[in-house]
Amino acid sequence: MTGSEIAEFMANQGNSVYLIEMLPEIGTGSGLINKIDLMQYLFVANVEMLTNYELNSIGEKSIKLQSLKEDREVELDIDKVVISLGVKSDNEFYEKMKNNFNKVYLIGDAASPRKIAHAVREGFERAYILR
């Protein structure tokens, strides 16, 4: 989702934006309602979405993409590249806090990468316990 949100932000700043995804669909890690909203925002912002493509190389003023569906390479003229890849857990802050405070919980992507709906639910459940 982060890459999609960055694409929307940059497009709304007046940039022409390509959103390149290796998977067959944009926003597969989000819930249905979030995905519908996301796709509407990207459409309104005129973000050009390319699915089933892999980044092969970044040149000074272009990028080369390889289609994952057919034996075809595409070259796009660009000015800037923003790369948003995957999710990695980071619980460093939790480790510092757990010994200094009672009722410290590790949640969301800090615990392990997951879909946003699961992370939000987990946050709600932990907050409910703390009330």
PLM regions: where:
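A conserved FAD-binding loop/helix module that cradles the flavin
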Residues: G3-F9, E25-K35, E92, K98-F101, ...
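A Rossmann-like FAD-binding core segment of flavoenzymes
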Residues: A11-K96
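Intrinsically disordered, low-complexity Ser/Thr/Pro-rich tracts
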Residues: T2-G3, N46
